[in-house]
Amino acid sequence: LSPAIATGITKTGVGVDMVDLSSADPQEIQELVGHASGVVLGMPPLQASGDLSTNFGAVLAAMQPKQVFGLYESYGGDDEPIDPLRTKFLDLGLREAFKVIKVKDTPSEGIYQLCDESGTDLGQNLIQAAKIKQLKSLDSDLEKAIGRISGGLYIITAQKGEVKGAMLASWVSQASFTPPGFTVAVAKDRAIESLMQVGDRFVLNILEEGNYQVLMKHFLKRFPPGADRFAGVKTQTASNGSPILTDALAYLECEVASRMECSDHWIVYSQVTNGRVAKAEGLTAVHHRKVGNYY
């Protein structure tokens, strides 16, 4: 579970140090914690060794008020109760980056997704202030000019095993005739990015002008880690296994062929394998912006 949380954090550009508390030196732990912006801990076994108990104490002693924390059960069958340790962190005035992750059964794909998304939430929490500062420093005339680049409105939906994802997108452009293909820009810290690796399959749902507000509003919500993004939304299953939004104007079934890395996004080139238009006279919804420093 630790690597899944770490992967989610690193998606946001935040660095991660992983430490085995059963063997680390207490002085090293205090130095690492003292320089960190946040700490994530897995629960130790009930019958923890003296060194492990000492090192957990070293973590608590080194924590500072502006740091964030996250806790998860290790599913070893005999973990320490998670709630008492959470209370200790809260009593220190620390902020909880994500809800405690409780693992009652053998970790499933859904649990790993929960861990990944929880890590991403933590990372986004840490870089929020820096992002705001960066946006304020941008050239306003340049951003207004870039904002005149418009695009359609789409919702990407994907499913791999138990794991589902969805994302509202507007940075979409056709990129090839034969085979038919297009590109979509996906922010590195988006949860669905892990479902859009080379060979992965997904659906591009094309929204209709004058009939997109309900779907757009739903998928713009900030979902907590592990939440079902399709609850309350009419869907059917595509031949590639991904959800199709019933109220979309059209849909394309796609397979990721290649990816190009940019500074804060992945440009994902995908080939289209199937598709259908629900309303022949319908027009694609268009998204107009005023500035280019947000979607």
Locate each region found by the language model:
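Residue-level detector of flexible, active-site-proximal loop/helix-junction positions
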Residues: 23-25, 76, 101-107, 211, ...
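Alpha-helix N-cap/loop-to-helix boundary motif
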Residues: 20-21, 28, 48, 148, ...
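Generic recognition of flexible, low-complexity loop/linker segments
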Residues: 27-29, 256
